[in-house]
A protein has these predicted regions:
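A short glycine-rich, Lys/Arg-flanked "PGG" loop and its adjoining helix->strand segment in the class I
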Residues: 34-51
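A short hydrophobic/small-residue beta-strand
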Residues: 52-53, 143
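C-terminal lobe and adjacent flexible extensions of AdoMet/dcAdoMet transferase-like proteins
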Residues: 123-173
Length: 173
């Protein structure tokens, strides 16, 4: 496993047949310049015909929760018999398509007493279908498939939670 900044990833020219940027991480590149750099770096590491899988949130769905309201995201039991509560709120800058999120982690012990609270500021871009297709084309990729979920369901803009892109390297840049 390699941990590096994907914008400047240098794994050798044409070394791989498959690349994946998991967990919607690509959307954390909020600047178009950074998105282009990342796609070019991935492109460079793939062989001709190599595939790149890039899951993104569906902006039509994801933007609905970027309204500033505090939302519970989940409660999870801990190994010690306690509880982890994850919540957060987010706002969308409609002019840039960037969401600012403040994620809260509350740790409770087995007696339900609050032991710790952590805050994680996050930023991510909501990249629409045509915008990502244009970025991919500019980096030398063609879409092979676009799924609406991780079960490879059909992408329906009005209802699919995700855009799971499968791209193929078609040309050298």
């Amino acid at each position: 496993m390699l941990r590096a900044d994907v914008r400047y990833l240098d794994l050798g020219e044409g070394e791989f047949i498959l690349a994946l940027i998991p967990l919607h991480s690509f959307s954390e590149l909020v600047l178009p310049r950074d998105q282009k750099l990342a796609l070019r770096a991935v492109h460079g590491s793939l062989r001709e015909g190599g595939r790149f899988v890039c899951p993104l949130p569906n902006p039509a769905i994801r933007a609905r929760s970027a309204d500033g309201a505090l939302r519970l995201n989940g409660s999870f039991s801990t190994a010690e018999g306690g509880l982890l509560v994850v919540s957060g709120f987010e706002t969308l800058d409609e002019s840039s398509g960037v969401v600012d999120r403040l994620q809260l982690y509350e740790f409770f012990d087995a007696s339900k007493e609050l032991c710790a609270k952590r805050v994680l500021p996050m930023r991510f871009a909501l990249i629409d279908r045509s915008g990502f297709a244009e970025l991919a084309d500019g980096a030398g990729f063609v879409p092979v498939a676009l799924y609406g979920d991780y079960d490879r369901g059909e992408y329906v803009e009005e209802s699919s939670p995700f855009m799971v892109w499968v791209l193929e390297k078609t040309r050298r840049l």
